[in-house]
Design a protein with these regions (language model features):
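The substrate-binding groove and active-site-proximal loops of carbohydrate-active enzymes
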Residues: 1-12, 16, 57-70, 304
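Carbohydrate-binding surfaces of carbohydrate-active enzymes
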Residues: 21-254, 327-330, 394
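Short strand-edge motifs at loop-to-beta-strand transitions and within beta-strands
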Residues: 140-142, 179-183, 265-267, 304-308, ...
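Aromatic-lined ligand-binding clefts that engage carbohydrates, nucleic acids, or primary amines
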Residues: 150-165, 269-292, 299-300, 322-324
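Residue-level detector of high-confidence beta-strand sites
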Residues: 173, 298, 372-374
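Noncatalytic modules at the cell exterior or secretory-pathway interfaces
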Residues: 186-198, 313-326, 388-401
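C-terminal functional regions that serve as terminal interaction/effector modules
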Residues: 200-201, 208-209, 285-290, 294-300, ...
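Aromatic, loop-rich ligand-recognition surfaces of beta-strand-rich domains
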Residues: 296, 351-365, 376-402
Length: 402
């Protein structure tokens, strides 16, 4: 999430394949068909935490919904030249038809904080796994002492996307992608309620990062203006799992206007025929979608993915149900089904999302570069060679074309 959709030209792919075939080199294609990481099965890259989109399309020869692409035919034509004598490639099966679904409203709403399960009591902060939960979101709640001054709240290692509320009012959103962990607390009365809602976004699944606990994995502290640090204790912890039974079992109420805090939204649409479709999520902020009880996957407004693939076999003639857990509130609680996906619409606002906080700017005034050059266009390793030994602090790359 928050990065450009991965693509590669058919020309480059076929060129690389031909070179290996001509040299009798074994290889595999990553991906021939990427498919979809349904539900919460999307992982994350390492070492810098980079959660993977629900779509695993990867601009592959066979696209997310199983349809062949122009790139597929280029690969097929190439491979046909390397078949043993007398063999031929099999026929291409027919594609599953796609359908459009007219815009429909999700005007039944259940506010998350009004539909919490029974809490678990814990003196100290612990990770999500300590409360027998592996995916989804988790809510940590405690009360704070009185303070006449502002204080700094520090949440150490919130994995992966946290919202902080004080007496029901949202104070901040903290993203692991941006390395955020501090919030300024306003003056408050004794017993003010602190809520920290943390969403797990996908585990790093290789290398040292494979030990990727979720929730708040270390500690929560407040620091006064005179530097006194207090570790917060006595937590009520609410599991918010991702199973459909939990999402469905809510007290939904009619609500036409969008809310700006976490809530479940429910709506239905009618079909005369079924087929694959792509739910357009551009009205929604961040969350999870279920269709007819199936966990379709995560969405996030920052993109680049703006649609969710729904296989036609999970739809039915007649009434179909959609439930959405939206963590920050939609622009409008409505959606539609498209016949083509939107996988390359990056909507990151402001400065570089993953690497720069608000107010942080790189000032190179007066600095002289020790070397300036360009890379040639194309794939493969390229090297930078300095004419002499140099001392450097920054290595900057600028995209000259795309």
């Amino acid at each position: 999430w928050g990065a450009k959709h991965e693509t590669r030209s058919a020309e480059d792919l076929v060129k690389g394949m031909k070179e290996m075939l001509d040299r009798n080199i074994s290889f595999s294609l990553y991906m021939t068909h990427g498919g979809t990481s349904f539900g919460h099965w999307g992982g994350a890259n390492f070492p810098n935490f980079s959660p993977t989109c629900t779509s695993y399309d990867y601009d592959a020869p066979i696209n997310e919904s199983g349809k062949v692409t122009p790139k597929y035919f280029e690969v097929r034509n190439l491979l046909s030249n390397y078949l043993p004598e007398g063999e031929s490639l099999s026929e291409i099966p027919d594609s599953i038809p796609t359908i459009a679904i007219p815009s429909f409203k999700l005007n039944e709403v259940a506010i998350l904080f009004d539909n919490l399960p029974e809490p678990k009591i814990s003196e100290n902060i612990q990770s999500m796994e300590a409360f027998d939960q592996g995916w989804g979101s988790i809510l940590y709640r405690t009360t704070l002492p009185a303070s006449k001054e502002e204080q700094t709240l520090t949440i150490t290692e919130a994995h992966d996307w946290a919202q902080v509320f004080l007496d029901g009012k949202k104070l901040a959103t903290l993203s692991r992608l941006k390395g955020e962990g501090t919030v300024i607390l306003p003056p408050m009365n004794e017993g003010a309620q602190l809520d920290i809602l943390v969403e797990a976004m996908g585990r790093m699944n290789f290398g040292k990062g494979i030990y990727d606990w979720k929730g708040i994995t270390e500690k929560v502290e407040i620091q006064s203006n005179n530097g006194v640090i207090t570790s917060l204790k006595n937590w009520k912890v609410y599991n918010i799992p991702v199973d459909y039974a939990f999402a469905q079992n809510k007290e939904f109420m009619k609500q036409d206007n969008p809310l700006k805090y976490p809530a479940y939204y429910r709506g239905t649409f009618m079909l005369d025929k079924t087929g694959d479709t792509f739910l357009n999520m551009t009205n929604w902020s961040k969350g999870m979608v279920w269709v007819n009880g199936y966990a379709i996957g995560r969405y996030w407004e920052i993109g680049p993915q703006q649609t969710l693939y729904v296989p036609g076999c999970w739809l039915k003639k007649g009434e179909n149900e959609v439930i959405i857990l939206d963590m920050a509130g939609p622009v409008q609680p409505q959606m539609e089904g498209l016949q083509q996906p939107i996988l390359d619409n990056l909507r990151v606002h402001g400065a570089a999302y993953a690497h720069r906080k608000v107010g942080e700017n790189l000032d190179l005034t007066g600095e002289e570069p020790v070397y300036v050059g360009t890379f040639k266009s194309g794939n493969g390793w390229q090297h930078v060679k300095f004419g002499k030994e140099v001392e450097t602090r920054f290595f900057c790359l600028e995209a000259l074309n795309a």
